[in-house]
Amino acid sequence: MILNERQYMITKAQIKKFQSAIENLEKKVPPQDNKNEQLRHQSYLASLNGEIEELSEQVEEYEKLKTQQIEKLECNSLEELPEALIKARIFRGLTQGQLAKLLNVKEQQVQRDEANQYANSSFTKILKVQRALDIEIKEEVIFK
């Protein structure tokens, strides 16, 4: 998941590098009689294409959040809440630094919290983030 503009730019650059690598690989087709080289070549191409697809999905999601092209975020369990908070920050157009100011903490703290998916954060902190983002979280308690 892309957390900020810096990661967004890095991810887009990575996609270009992978695309360039694919173009170079496609110019170097192994001989027909060398099946091992052909399989290795195809495997490498598939791997690069898979990386491009995954990174492109992350870029697309980040762009949709930044341009507010979504109506709501799905949060089907508490495990998904940290990612939903990060996405809500991006949707609101806030940088990590701006959220930090709203929370009266240092930007590095927000960066750590998001990088760790709020793993070490108290419930009180998560509520503060939710309030700062001005979002409503609805969850059902289901008995199994």
What are these regions (language model features)?
Residues 79-91:
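Short, amphipathic alpha-helical "recognition" segments used to contact nucleic acids or chromatin
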Residues 93-113:
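Short alpha-helical DNA-recognition segment
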Residues 123-140:
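DNA major-groove recognition helix of helix-turn-helix/homeodomain DNA-binding modules
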